Amino acid sequence: MISIYICEDQHHQLEQISQVIENHILIENLDMSIALKAKSPVELLNEIEGNKTSNIYFLDVDLQSSMNGIELAEAIRKNDPRGFIIFVTTHSEMSHLTFKYKVEALDFIIKGDLATMKKQIISCLDNITQKLALASPELQKRFNLRTKDKTVNVAYDDIYFFE
């Protein structure tokens, strides 16, 4: 299971982002879950310290803290070099800093219109799911069957015939 960490200092925004993520996980039956909804960078860093798995991070840039979201991403990279970092912020002018700090962000989502933000968050989660499937040899050797309410993955070795 892939863990998702959200760091957003505004409670309303934190709940909006987490609701979009939780709904998409349920609808698509993804092997992901929100591990932490943090309001401070220190809380998130303490949680992931020593964790050696790749995770997903949704980070605000302006965290009203001594550390901004881009500096937080830089600290995350030291612990999780393969993690997926997505910035969700109102500060579009700071997008160039992701290159300066070399954090390799997957996306830079601008807050504002909830419908647009929702589409971009879902697009990020789908993109991550595809990347993980391509990176995992055992997932490549699986048959994916999508029904109305869920997706089932079956190893090709376990399939004898289709009826």
Model-derived features with residue positions:
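Non-catalytic signal-transmission and effector/linker regions of two-component phosphorelay proteins
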Residues: 1-5
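Conserved acidic carboxylate
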Residues: 8
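Charged phosphotransfer/docking patches of two-component systems
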Residues: 11-18, 95
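Acidic, metal-coordinating helix/loop segments flanking the phosphotransfer/catalytic sites
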Residues: 15-19, 33-56
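Short helix-capping segments at alpha-helix termini
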Residues: 25-31, 80
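CheY-like receiver
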Residues: 54-133
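Conserved binding/recognition cores within well-folded domains
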Residues: 120-163
